[in-house]
A protein has these predicted regions:
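Beta-strand-rich domains and repeat architectures in extracellular enzymes and scaffolds
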Residues: 1-16, 52-55
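Recurrent small/Gly-Pro-centered beta-turn motifs in extracellular repeat architectures
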Residues: 3-7, 60, 66-69, 114-118, ...
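Structural motif
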Residues: 9-26, 71-80, 120-134, 177-199, ...
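Blade-loop segments of beta-propeller domains
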Residues: 18-61, 67
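Surface-exposed loop and turn segments in beta-propeller and other repeat-based domains
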Residues: 28-49, 90-97, 139-154, 201-229
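Repeated scaffold domains used in trafficking and secretory/extracellular systems
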Residues: 47-55, 94-107, 152-161, 228-237
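Short coil/turn segments that connect the beta-strands within blades of beta-propeller domains
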Residues: 60-61, 109-111, 165-167, 241-243
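Loop/turn-rich, solvent-exposed surfaces of beta-rich toroidal or solenoidal domains
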Residues: 152-217
Length: 281
């Protein structure tokens, strides 16, 4: 399994402070077995830098990473890294586009799904957002099809995962709450499930009717204050060998550290038994 960790700390306008690390996990159920940082030489300040990287997926031995550019101009891109050894630079291609996205998942053939943070124009009150089915060509993200979906989860859109067998999963979390001592907290996450073949026709404010994907199930994970001060799910995947859902989590200890702040760590959680509940629309 591969994971990515953004290291911008909000310093988008200072490339020297922006970087992302890619990690390889031989066995994600072990915190020590075969865990290594890949020596891709993607360093701060270089044109090839991943900067504030969020979503990532793997297809045909290539990693596809969604990135925000640290220039304050609202530029975003997908970087394709052709995986090699851990001691060499990997060939890469950057594909730019105008929409902010934190999530990517392989769809079919050379197509991918990008989850945008852009609501359908005029339909923001209904929490309807865009899923773009895209391919990559000549340094650009090319949109082949736009699908709309209703967000029946929380306010913040996080990671996605799609497969023909399991359908589409979307991670949502409650908004972050900031504290004077620098602590950041979110108290709940909800994973939505969408059957891409099922839609509901809805009339938008432009007078036209559009097919809208409606989540059919949701998996809630509320904050357990006895275990964590904050618990933020960021990405989701399905283990193809066990059919277990696995999620990456940024969590903070419930016990404050020496500086009065709650130390944060990254976790991988595996849910071996999940009870899906029907979302109320």
């Amino acid at each position: 399994m591969y994971g990515i960790k953004a290291g911008t700390n909000g310093e988008y306008k200072e490339p020297s402070k922006c970087a992302a690390a890619i990690w390889e996990f031989e066995d994600y159920t072990s915190s020590t077995k075969g865990v290594k940082r890949l020596a891709n030489k993607v360093v701060p300040g270089e044109k090839r830098c991943l900067y504030h990287a969020n979503g990532m997926d793997i297809y045909n031995h290539e990693l596809y990473v969604t990135c925000a550019e640290p220039n304050g101009k609202g530029e975003y891109s997908v970087v394709k890294l052709t995986m090699g050894s851990t001691s060499e630079e990997w060939p890469y291609n950057r594909y730019t586009w105008e929409n902010r996205t934190n999530a990517i998942s392989h769809y079919k053939g050379n197509q991918f799904i990008l989850l945008t943070e852009t609501g359908a124009e005029g339909e923001e009150d209904k929490k309807i957002y865009k899923l773009c089915i895209v391919h990559f060509s000549a340094g650009k993200v090319v949109v082949d099809q736009t699908k709309y979906f209703m967000n029946t989860g929380y306010e913040v859109l996080q990671g996605i995962n799609y497969s023909d067998k399991y359908g589409l999963f979307i991670v949502t979390t409650k908004k972050l709450e900031y504290f004077p001592n620098g602590d950041v907290q979110t108290s709940g996450s909800r994973v939505l499930h969408i059957d891409m073949s099922r839609t509901k026709t809805m009339k938008f404010k432009d007078g036209k009717k559009y097919p809208v994907l409606i989540p059919d199930f949701a998996f809630n994970n509320e904050l357990d204050e006895s275990k964590f001060f904050s618990f933020e799910m960021e990405s989701v995947a399905i283990d193809r060998n066990t059919n277990n859902m696995i999620v990456s989590v940024n969590a903070n200890s419930p016990i404050a550290g020496d500086n009065g702040k709650h130390p944060g760590e990254d976790y991988i959680y595996r849910f071996s038994s999940i009870e899906f509940k029907l979302s109320l629309i």
